[in-house]
Amino acid sequence: PLAGPDVFGISSGAGLAVAIVMLAFGGNIALGDFMGADFLGNGATAGVGVSGFLAILIAAFVGAMLVMAVITFFSAIVRSHTVLLIIGLMVGYLASSAISLLNFFSTAEGVKSYMVWGMGSFGNVSAAQVLWFIPLALIALIASLLLVKPLNAMLLGEQYAENLGFNIRRLRIILLLITGFLTAVVTAFCGPIAFIGLATPHIARLLIGTENHRRLLPVTMLLGSVLALLCNLFCTLPSGGGIIPLNAVTPLFGAPVIIYVLLKRR
């Protein structure tokens, strides 16, 4: 029940790679090119903006995929899900430690840029950036929907799925690529968003009362977007022109759900 990109350290890995890119350029990519209004704009800044965006996107993807590769490697050795979860948490702590060291040795502008990005926000995503986000996300979402049959077969056990003719090793690799790609895309645009990906599948199961991925995946996608927008709405409620960081609100929705699921399984 605790499997998620933030718990297994995937988001932390993506965040570490982005931190290396951002802090290496003193925050110029984050503030000037990637987050700024000139991204994909006119004139000479357009090419720089695209380069900055691609650097962050590629860095997030590489960081997420490296952590996913580590988790996949240990999953072939460790049978206990609890031990695998602890390994994921330790990987996340290592990434967080490296990020802290990078912040310590970086410039004030670089630290500010990364801290603003790391708190998570939808407000810095412009309409031009959405044109990049939609096709990239749709590719991975459609690919995940094509895996409904093997995922349903996996519910009855790996041996049963193999007897039906599904290649479990190839399925795991495909799921690895899809998960890493989606995590990288969301992290690159909005920063590391916690608890949404962890809690939404459990809420969807409680609402529809089934494990059938043919229904569960679409409901989870829709519900995840609704919860994300709801959290973003709460972030904009305070007066005074300030916006609360997204990661300050998402645990208010996600943590109670996870606690409930753990108590129910007990």
Regions found by a protein language model. Name each.
Residues 1-266:
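Alpha-helical transmembrane segments in inner-membrane proteins
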